[in-house]
Amino acid sequence: MFSLEAWIGLRYLRAKKRNGFMSFITMVSIAGIALGVTALIVVLSVMNGFQKEIRGQLLNVAPHAEIGYIDNTDTDWRNLLRFTENRKGILAAAPYVSNQALLANAGEIRGVQMRGILPSEERKVVEYGDKMPAGKFEDLIPGEFDIILGVGLAEALGAEVGNKVTVITPEGNVTPAGVVPRLKQFTVVGLVKTGVYEVDNSLAMTHIQDARVLYRLDKEVAGLRLKLADPQNAPALTATLIPEAQRDAVWVRDWTYSNRSYFEAVELEKRMMFIILTLIIAVAAFNLVSSLVMAVTEKQADIAILRTLGLSPAGVMKIFMVQGAFSGFFGTLAGVVCGVLLGWNVGRVVAFFENLLGVHLINSQVYFIDYLPSDVDMGDVALIACISLGLSFVATLYPSRRASKTQPAEALRYE
């Protein structure tokens, strides 16, 4: 059962106000809270979805972990397998070498990350090997100096399958005329499409033996790219992968280290958006203060009568706290319902307006993806609801305290 104070507070909330402007202010404050909660849930859901989608795409094209020798203290990559074989959580390992290079064709020059791979093993650690627009890993034949390019890189160079491109390495040849760049022609035998803009526009792959020749490496030099059963557990797994005694000779890093700055930037942006959009709820709470102050002024006679009948100042305070708290509750509830529903369907809503207006709002060259993802996190929803209810409760304190100080004789003097 409701207490007397709660019953009166609810009656005041739903009763028709003599002051129409006060009713309008109350509705605006409730709508403002609902709008703020909705906006906060939708924005955080989109950022969660974006972060999750990008993480998934990166894990399809980037190694979950990498391991190699420091300063080439050992030249045989097979010795690295002793750290990964029969290790729970590691599904596959593939050798690789990697270095920077320039690719030139038809007057165009692009910087690339040149990767030497072992075709039979590379397929085990990446997801895009079966979805190549042209060619396949097995087309890389050692000694033939073949190359597979990202689709964006091939388009920028004007290169197609069967064309030859010139690879320029950072290390030059020393001649009597001075140091000249090392040049080598490679034949394009395939194209890779990962779906990640930066990768598709900078990746070039060749056979690991040809890469060693190109960069003048020992015939067995390579690191290992690892595929894990649970990529989210990569930091914990890599922390124990190398025995303490051998950490001076072997390095290991996981995907969170390689992409740390990017995900830290996204997380920082998420926090800032949370703070900024919380201010919308705070502004609505100030409106709630205004509506309650006006309610206290309108109900002076009622307060005086209740005090005369024996209601304590604390009881009067509770009446208006209940009125304000329920206003905040209704606004929060409406915001949560609208926010969750819109968060689940924001991708469809954006796609509808894109089709209606004939514009494309999400540029894959900037955001890696061409649609708006969303992931409603109920933990975020609960936190937002608690903050909204907390701000609404704080907003009731001043008007309620003012009401509790009403003197019956003064309030009834002019009635």
Curated annotation (Swiss-Prot):
InterPro entries reported in the protein's UniProt record: ABC3_permease_C (IPR003838), Lipoprotein-release_system (IPR051447), LolCE_TM (IPR011925), MacB_PCD (IPR025857)
Pfam family, any one: FtsX
Domain of life: Bacteria
Principal subcellular localization: membrane
Record localization: Cell inner membrane
KW Membrane (keyword) present: yes
Record's bilayer topology term: Multi-pass membrane protein
One GO cellular component term: plasma membrane protein complex
Keyword Thylakoid: no
GO biological process, one term: lipoprotein localization to outer membrane
Transmembrane segments: 24-44, 273-293, 324-344, 378-398
Keywords assigned by UniProt, alphabetized: Cell inner membrane, Cell membrane, Membrane, Transmembrane, Transmembrane helix, Transport
Task performed by this protein: Part of an ATP-dependent transport system responsible for the release of lipoproteins targeted to the outer membrane from the inner membrane. Such a release is dependent of the sorting-signal (absence of an Asp at position 2 of the mature lipoprotein) and of LolA.
Family: Belongs to the ABC-4 integral membrane protein family. LolC/E subfamily.
UniProt name for this protein: Lipoprotein-releasing system transmembrane protein LolC
Species whose genome carries this gene: Neisseria meningitidis serogroup B (strain ATCC BAA-335 / MC58)
Classification lineage: Bacteria, Pseudomonadati, Pseudomonadota, Betaproteobacteria, Neisseriales
Gene transcribed to yield this protein: lolC
